[in-house]
Amino acid sequence: MKIYQKVLLFVATIFTIGTVSKEVHANEFNFSVNPVLPENQIGESGYFNLQMSPGQSQTLTISLKNTTDKTVVVEEEIASATTNINGVVEYSPNKIKADSTLKYNLVDYASIPKEVSLQPNSSQQVKVSVTMPKENFNGVIAGGITFKEKDSEKTNSKSKGLSIQNKYAYVVALLMKQNKNTVAPDLKLNSVEPSQVNYRNVINANLQNPKAGYLNQMYVQAEVKGLSNSKLSYKANKEMLQMAPNSNFDYPVSIGDGNKLEAGKYRLSMTVYGQKNNDGKFTYVDSKGKEQKFDYQWKFTKDFTILGKTASKLNSKDVTVKKTPWYENWLIWLGLLLILLALFFLFFILWKKRKKEEEEQDLEKEKLKAQLEAMREQISKEDNSDETDV
């Protein structure tokens, strides 16, 4: 089994994008990436942040440099920005489904060769074709361009058939907008349901950003209380989350390791703060006891039900939940008892039937025996009568 750890690099630090640091050393790569920023670039960031006219087409340039004495093949791919379960924006390809509100997917408006071959100790410019939609709109089309060395997986360790491999990649963010108009943020709560994260039971609250703008500096307070069982209460507070434009993600509320999900009715209460501002009208006390001011606040309340079969299924897969030995499960004992009773009842019916058949056979034998005795007596009488006549 392979465990791939994606390391996202080359996304610069800016409040509209977030912070992604270089977590691997340069010697992990056999090539370097340098975006050539065009004249319509907004700001001095190290990624593409373009202002374009409706319908405008443009070719971007990214310089790749092979720093080794061997040929390096680099795979290239474009992806739309998404939000992962940790409340972090991802710019690289992943399995997260596009949100229903995403009207302009970057994949449909940008293209790049699938791969490029870099000769030893050489540089090469890669061209990226981008086109702005013809319709006028406010907001941003967000995504990223990923560069990964082909077959670049590096095995760290092997043990009993398990190989842990790291896959390193450069990711250059690509933002496209028609103007600098601010998009008023919005946040919706779509659904609440039990699920699992890393084979541990959680209750997922799906949050959706339906607008074409980033939701930045999000602080979330969430609590799930049992309505069927008032003793049940689970909390999950997180700070400094971010959501990509037109995206959604599952915010997990852990029920704690070793705890079983219980069937019944529940209520989720959630408060989300967004965009720090010292003059903001909404106050949040952070984990350090310090007051934080925000421009936006959303409050959600939603009731939901966990079915018994759903709870049982998830509990059986939770690696932290102690599994009840079969001999301690009263349902198994009840089942065995019912089977024994059924077998006893069946045996009793068969025994009664067989006994009845035997009694009927004995009765027939007695009747036959009586008939034979009667015939014998009749014959004997007839013989005696004949002797008298003689």
Protein language model features and the residues they cover:
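Intrinsically disordered, low-complexity Pro/Gly/Ser/Thr-rich segments with frequent PxxP/GP/PP motifs
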Residues: 97-136, 227-261
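Terminal connector regions
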Residues: 72-94, 131-179, 260-317
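Sec-dependent N-terminal signal peptides of Gram-positive bacterial secreted proteins and lipoproteins
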Residues: 2-26, 332-351
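Cytoplasmic C-terminal tails of single-pass
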Residues: 355-390
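N-terminal edge beta-strand
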Residues: 29-57, 194
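Short, solvent-exposed loop/turn segments enriched in Ser/Thr/Gly
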Residues: 54-61, 123-126, 138-144, 199-203
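Short solvent-exposed strand-capping/beta-turn motif centered on an Asx-Ser/Thr pair
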Residues: 65-70, 81-83, 135, 208-214
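Membrane-proximal extracellular "stem/stalk" segments
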Residues: 180-188, 192-329
